[in-house]
Amino acid sequence: MKNVTDSFVYLGHWPSAGSFGFNTDILATNLINLSVVFGVLIFFGKGVLNDLLDNRKQRILNTIRNSEELREGAIQQLENARARLRKVEKEADQFRVNGYSEIEREKLNLINSTYRTLKQLENYKNETILFEQQRTINQVRERVFQQALQGAIVTLKSCLSNELHLRTINANIGMFGTMKEITD
């Protein structure tokens, strides 16, 4: 290794007029000097560059693996959320169906209860009307009977004398007597 560096140092001290050598002026470098520099960089920097690239590759692969794991976790969480959503939607549908059927049942119960109440009120109304009709008929009968009785009393008072009255009483007593004999 010492020989290689010595030869480079020796080449750097050659006279520059008409001879071959390294140009140490950075701004005036030529293609050969650049290729030698690149060769040295590649030879010595290859390991460092490979290590840097391997480290970068490992970081990228680790990032990809982490991203994949996060993606799989997110997919699993999404599936769990979808399953919960389906379950909740199913329960909501069940509650909705049960709610609608409960509402319909309550509606029918209310309609039936109202119908029964109206039927009872109709029956009470009919009974009240019938009672009032009977009461009115009885009042009319009583009034007609009273008027007829008063008319009969007036007629009897005007038509009956004491003698006629006594004969009617005796005739009625006689009829009751004969009826009593027949029944005995």
Curated annotation (Swiss-Prot):
It is found in: Plastid, Chloroplast thylakoid membrane. Keywords: ATP synthesis, CF(0), Chloroplast, Hydrogen ion transport, Ion transport, Membrane, Plastid, Thylakoid, Transmembrane, Transmembrane helix, Transport. GO terms for molecular function: proton-transporting ATP synthase activity, rotational mechanism. CDD domains: ATP-synt_Fo_b (cd06503). Its main location: plastid. Pfam families: ATP-synt_B. GO terms for cellular component: chloroplast thylakoid membrane; proton-transporting ATP synthase complex. Disulfide bonds: none annotated. It is a single-pass membrane protein. The chain crosses the membrane at residues 27-49. InterPro entries: ATP_synth_b/b'su_bac/chlpt (IPR002146). Signal peptide: none annotated. HAMAP family: ATP_synth_b_bprime. In plastids the F-type ATPase is also known as CF(1)CF(0). F(1)F(0) ATP synthase produces ATP from ADP in the presence of a proton or sodium gradient. F-type ATPases consist of two structural domains, F(1) containing the extramembraneous catalytic core and F(0) containing the membrane proton channel, linked together by a central stalk and a peripheral stalk. During catalysis, ATP synthesis in the catalytic domain of F(1) is coupled via a rotary mechanism of the central stalk subunits to proton translocation. F-type ATPases have 2 components, F(1) - the catalytic core - and F(0) - the membrane proton channel. F(1) has five subunits: alpha(3), beta(3), gamma(1), delta(1), epsilon(1). F(0) has four main subunits: a(1), b(1), b'(1) and c(10-14). The alpha and beta chains form an alternating ring which encloses part of the gamma chain. F(1) is attached to F(0) by a central stalk formed by the gamma and epsilon chains, while a peripheral stalk is formed by the delta, b and b' chains. Belongs to the ATPase B chain family. This is ATP synthase subunit b, chloroplastic.
